[in-house]
Amino acid sequence: LTQRSNPRSVRICFGEIIMDEDWRESTIKKEALDYHEAEPKGKIKVVPTKPHSTAHELSLAYSPGVAYPCLEIAEKPDDAYRYTSKGNLVAVISNGTAVLGLGNIGALASKPVMEGKGLLLKTFADIDVFDIQVDTEDPEEFIKTVCNIAPTFGGINLEDIKAPECFEIERRIAEATDIPVMHDDQHGTAIISGAALLNAAELQGKELSNIKVVVAGAGASAIACANHYVSLGVKMSNIVMCDSKGIMTKNRLDDGDLNEFKAPFAVDSEDGSLADALVAADVFLGLSRGGLVTGEMVAKMADKPIIFALANPTPEIMPHEVTAVRSDAIIATGRSDYPNQVNNVLGFPYIFRGALDVRARDITQGMKMAATKALAALAKEPV
């Protein structure tokens, strides 16, 4: 039953009133633009942390007093953690080549996302942030820039950098610096979706070693999630990954159509579409673009399916589209305005908090696995 009126339309489905998506999106758009435009512009700012109201305090903060910590650090670089904000300062850095589900929109256009990460790091983990947009698509220039400014920071959060360049960028920056470096699109997504998978599989009575997982998308987050799922117990042979051309098969690998990062996920099957892959699938992991999945495709999945439609800002399929065809599905999205949010904010603030607190030089696979299991356990705690 559908009831329509201006300026909104309402769909009544399964006893719930669901706002028309066009109306919902137009409302959110206006509210979001007003939110960002309100004074002061943007979402983050720098504030002093020491007294500075007298001439004497200013002489300690700057000349002549500032010379003394400079000399101490010159003699013993590790004292930067003692006399500066380095130990609680993270750089959120992007070149804007893979922003949310918006694609390559450029470095400057990525700034609202980086400011948003800064707000979340400060709010949830009390970590200070400089957001930095590097205006280059050249991996060598990007790596050099980040490595040159790395001494300022206690950690580096790489963000919204397209694949496959992101893999080499993260690896080389991590090797060249002595502070924790994490590409959140890869590892943050893997950690939080891995935790969700553990709990969803338990709720649906499925063993990880037996489930068929279909991944829509073959970029940074998709490849990292698939690798992490294997570490959790999913069989590599049970993962079917689809890129923009369809199922990643050994035929396509033989034709030179898959790069070195996609190659391990080439399956020995006929070429096909995402719809073909989803037949009898237990899990759908969407890390691609909005509107990619239909109710008809979901209807052909296995009993008690698990659907993680994590494309942002628009999921691959809306929750009400799933419930219209399945009463036995677990559905999650990356959005905070729908139930069952699976979003990186559940992970990256606390991962960096822990890494900074122990002065970790790297964010290791063991740390990622521990975070995954801790999140899964936390979700079971009473609210």
Specify the residue positions occupied by each region the protein language model found.
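Rossmann-like adenosine-cofactor binding region
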Residues: K262-I330, R335-D337
